[in-house]
């Protein structure tokens, strides 16, 4: 039945089955530029979900194109094209999930239940299979040997204030590395979520680094080693930066703010 529904979706969308996929992600790029805004300082962003709601048909059109991509087509893409596709799909489908209940929610967690988190809801088709947001992040992006880049944790957006910013543009293959690095720099420069505490001498960082510590350690000797490369972002005082570079600061994890990252 699911395969039949996918086939019908493709057949009923003119040109979708045979058109080459647009790796500029122009439809999503237009929506993001229109409905995502950086907050003062440029470290965090807000989404205008009311605006996304008004442009819901445009969002659906983009997601229909994403859902129409076959596994065979995907397999023929470059690594950067694949990762940009998955990040954009995750972020756009997250907005779509929020719109299923907007404005009657305060957090994406309101869309879950005691038995199932919102990230495990299978509500869309991707590469020919019914998927959840967790399927994209945990099963595809974080799959060992697929991309192995911890910077993705500053790219996929969970529609929450505690989450690294939703970008006001689409991720694209030819500038993906720069976009991922920029996301890390912006997030670690936000001292409301990542900072050195001079009173305690400890590094207070987002809970993301606790949840996914092994991803960061896999690219360095340890999480502390990975963080040390960004000492100048985590602290303003050169003395505190040196403590971070020498990996002498103990780590504390800050509470995560699951409040919706809404403009309202």
Language-model regions, residue ranges each:
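Sec/Tat signal peptide C-region and signal peptidase I cleavage site
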Residues: 15-19
């Amino acid at each position: 039945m699911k395969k039949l529904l996918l086939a019908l979706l493709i057949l009923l969308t003119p040109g979708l089955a045979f058109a080459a996929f647009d790796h500029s992600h122009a439809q999503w790029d237009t929506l993001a530029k229109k409905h995502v805004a950086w907050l003062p300082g440029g470290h965090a962003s807000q989404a205008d979900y009311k605006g996304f709601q008004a442009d819901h048909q445009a969002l659906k059109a983009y997601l229909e194109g994403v859902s129409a991509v076959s596994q065979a087509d995907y397999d023929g893409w470059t690594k950067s094209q694949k990762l940009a596709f998955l990040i954009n799909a995750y972020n756009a489908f997250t907005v779509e999930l929020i719109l299923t209940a907007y404005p009657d929610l305060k957090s994406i967690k309101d869309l879950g239940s005691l038995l199932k988190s919102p990230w495990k809801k299978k509500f869309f088709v991707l590469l020919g299979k019914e998927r959840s947001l967790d399927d994209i992040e945990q099963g595809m992006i974080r799959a060992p040997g697929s991309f192995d880049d911890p910077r993705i944790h500053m790219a996929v957006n969970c529609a929450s204030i505690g989450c690294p910013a939703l970008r006001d543009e689409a991720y694209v293959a030819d500038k993906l590395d720069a976009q991922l690095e920029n996301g890390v720099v912006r997030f670690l420069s936000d001292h409301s979520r990542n900072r050195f505490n001079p009173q305690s001498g400890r590094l207070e960082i987002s809970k993301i680094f606790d949840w996914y510590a092994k991803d960061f350690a896999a690219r360095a000797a340890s999480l502390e080693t990975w963080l040390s490369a960004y000492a100048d972002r985590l602290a303003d005082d050169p003395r505190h930066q040196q403590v971070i570079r020498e990996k002498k600061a103990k780590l504390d994890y800050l509470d995560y703010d699951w409040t919706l990252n809404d403009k309202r």
